Amino acid sequence: MKEQENSWNNGNIDDFMNTYWKNDSLIFIGKSGINYGWDKTIKNYKNSYKTKEQMGTLKFKNIICNPINDSTFIVTGKWSLKRNDSIGNLSGFYTLLWIKKLTGWKITYDHTS
């Protein structure tokens, strides 16, 4: 989660997306509904946050990690984006399913509101 914060706050969506499972079966649920696939998810991020100013400063809080087994965790918490007054701040909550893959720990399911 700290890697994601750092990548986001450096304006690097590509690095931010490295924690997501690069697969068509990735599920991302957000304000626009359910999206499937890593390609669709990164495209949506890049369309929504075209500049570093729009990205703002990301902070994750109240992170709770619940193990399902040795290779699966459910992570919940609050996210916030601090941005300048002309754009406005954003915040919400998330639930992530992290699964240990051959390439390391990856987010396979993201429900962000």
Predicted stretch roles:
Residues 13-67:
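A solvent-exposed, acidic/Ser-Thr-rich amphipathic alpha-helical stretch
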Residues 91-113:
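Short beta-strand edge/turn micro-motifs at domain boundaries
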Residues 53, 81-89:
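Short, cysteine-centered beta-strand-loop-beta hairpins and adjacent loop/turn segments enriched
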Residues 33-35, 81-82, 113:
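Solvent-exposed loop/turn segments at secondary-structure junctions
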Residues 71-79:
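A short hydrophobic beta-strand element
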Residues 45-46, 61-66, 79-81, 93-99:
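Hydrophobic/aromatic beta-strand elements that line small-molecule binding cavities or substrate pockets
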Residues 1-12:
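Short, aromatic-enriched amphipathic alpha-helices that serve as compact interaction elements
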